[in-house]
UniProtKB/Swiss-Prot annotation:
Claim: DNA-binding is one of the keywords in the record: yes
Function: Controls the transcription of genes involved in arginine and lysine metabolism.
Classification via PANTHER family: HTH-TYPE TRANSCRIPTIONAL REGULATOR ARGP, TRANSCRIPTIONAL REGULATOR
Residue intervals of the HTH lysR-type domain: 4-60
Annotated GO MF terms: DNA binding; DNA-binding transcription factor activity
Protein's recorded name: HTH-type transcriptional regulator ArgP
The entry's keywords: DNA-binding, Transcription, Transcription regulation
Length: 298
């Protein structure tokens, strides 16, 4: 019986990564019909679909598992083949990692910079909410993920990184305009806030747990950029919860003030990655864990 042909999965990976059959064909230097035929052969072999044919195409649950397998095999090939062939001209290894926006805006890039300088690696850092990134590792879409989840998924491990402390801040003018009578459920209901996106539960938790304010009762901007949070707060447009690590200078200079001293939202974060790692991925995991445990509150 014929086994699984990795050219079939290569075609699936190209379609998903490139976003269309046409671009996948260009990427692999084959015809579009060849791409379509390989995916049909894969689906026939498995007796189930691997691709949701919409725009852009998306993998089915079994397709995601195959992509995870394929990317792990590719990573192992990249580490082993140059040694076997004594070849130093191998293309950089491509690695996809899932991170939350606040880690990317504060400590993650300094943690990775030495590996990026010394190893041939192309990183794709994709931002997801802290509770969603682990799903990308489960599906095989990424090789590692920063998550709030402490429990490791099968065949992976979870290393504790540290704590991210969030403070609720605004500029002095904004504070006087909206909170001159104090920060309470009445004044919070009138003051515009900003959060990352509809999946951002941090601000909702802050309002309900500390002030018994329904999140849907406040003016709430969504901006998918941690850096824009800071700009909006500095401009006096909104108040926000933001990592203390990101605004150390602004708090010291007084351009931002902690409007709820005594209330601190903290999350423990973890690095989830494959148990059996080699080469550059192992170095990346070590760099992330070592840097975070040195620089984040523990």
């Amino acid at each position: 019986m014929r086994g699984l042909d990795y050219k079939w999965i290569e075609a699936l990976d190209a379609v998903v990564y490139q976003g269309s059959f046409e671009r996948a064909a260009e990427h692999l230097f084959v015809s579009q019909s060849a791409i379509s035929q390989r995916i049909k052969q894969l689906e026939k072999f498995l007796a189930q679909p691997v691709l949701i044919r919409e725009q852009p195409p998306k993998p089915t649950p079994i397709g995601k598992k195959l992509l995870g397998l394929y990317r792990r095999v590719r990573l192992l090939e990249h580490e082993i083949l140059p040694e076997i062939k004594n070849d130093t001209t191998t293309r950089p290894v491509q690695l996809s990692l899932a991170t939350n926006a606040d880690s990317l805006a504060t400590w993650l890039l300094p943690a990775l910079q030495d590996v990026m300088k010394t190893r041939q690696v192309e990183l794709k850092l994709t931002i997801y909410g802290e509770s969603r990134s682990i799903e990308k590792l489960k599906s095989g879409e990424v090789a590692g993920a920063i998550s709030l989840e402490s429990q490791a998924i099968p065949n992976c491990r979870a290393d504790y990184l540290g704590r991210i402390d969030y403070v609720c801040v605004a500029n002095p003018e904004f504070y006087q305009r909206y909170f001159s009578e104090g920060v309470n459920n009445q004044t919070l209901a009138k003051a515009p806030a900003v959060s990352y996106d509809q999946y951002d539960d941090l601000h909702k938790k802050f309002l309900t747990e500390h002030f018994n304010v329904r999140p849907d009762s406040v003016i709430h901007h969504n901006i998918s950029s941690s850096e824009a949070f800071l700009k909006m707060a500095l401009a006096g447009v909104a108040y926000c919860l933001i990592p203390r690590l990101q605004i150390t200078d602004e708090l010291e200079q007084g351009s931002l003030i902690d409007i709820t001293p005594g209330f601190l939202m903290s999350y423990r974060i973890y690095w989830h990655h494959w148990q059996l790692e080699t080469g550059v991925l192992q170095e990346i995991s070590q760099a992330i864990v070592n840097y975070a445990q040195r620089h984040l509150p523990q």
